[in-house]
Regions:
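C-terminal active-site-proximal or functional interface alpha/beta core segments in diverse enzymes
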Residues: 78-179
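Conserved alpha/beta-domain cores
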Residues: 1-118
């Protein structure tokens, strides 16, 4: 299928790429929790920033190429500050990996979660992204940045109607089960 780069967030997943090291590379996914996100994806996915250097060392010992870092602060994020924080931490990790000779991390995936209006008001996307663009300037020269703006692009295109068949409260928030 031509897919050559995959995302991992733990040593067990990284080890799975050892047999495919000649054909595939990985991004290390970091966790930056944002409890203000409608869906806090870093609760489920990503390693702590402190785990990056040990993961890079493991990748080197396995012969697995690490192309860069990845994070996704959540879905429907109202404020850009968690992106700014995450980019700053990633910039430091990229510099550290380069300075130590562990890896040339040339790619940063900043995820998605860019907000859309669901009947309420949100910042215009240019305003929302202004501090993110500023933070990206702190990245080492030559780092390529990609994003995953799925909701922002596809969200306004349709409406889904479902029947709620159940609900549960978890960590102070309601979860609804649909048909």
């Amino acid at each position: 299928f031509g897919i050559r780069t995959f995302v991992v967030d733990n040593p067990d997943e990284l080890r799975k790429f050892h047999p495919h090291r000649a054909r595939a590379a990985v991004l290390l996914r970091l966790s930056f929790r944002d409890p203000t996100a409608v869906v806090d994806l870093s609760r489920k996915f990503g390693c702590e920033p402190a785990a990056v250097v040990p993961m890079l060392e493991l990748a080197r010992s396995l012969g697995v190429k690490v192309r860069g870092l990845s994070f996704h602060v959540g879905s429907q994020v109202a404020e850009p500050k968690k992106y700014v924080e995450a980019i700053g931490v990633c910039a430091e990790l990229i510099e550290q990996a380069s300075a130590s000779g562990l890896a040339n991390l040339a790619l940063l995936d900043i995820g998605g979660g860019f907000p859309i209006a669901y009947g309420g008001t949100i910042q215009p996307i240019r305003e929302f992204c202004r501090p993110i663009r500023q933070a990206l300037k702190t990245l080492p020269r030559g780092v390529r940045v990609i994003a995953e703006p799925g909701r922002f692009i596809a969200g306004p295109s349709g409406t889904s109607i479902s029947t709620v068949v159940g609900r549960a409260q978890r960590e102070g928030r309601w979860w609804y089960y649909l048909d």
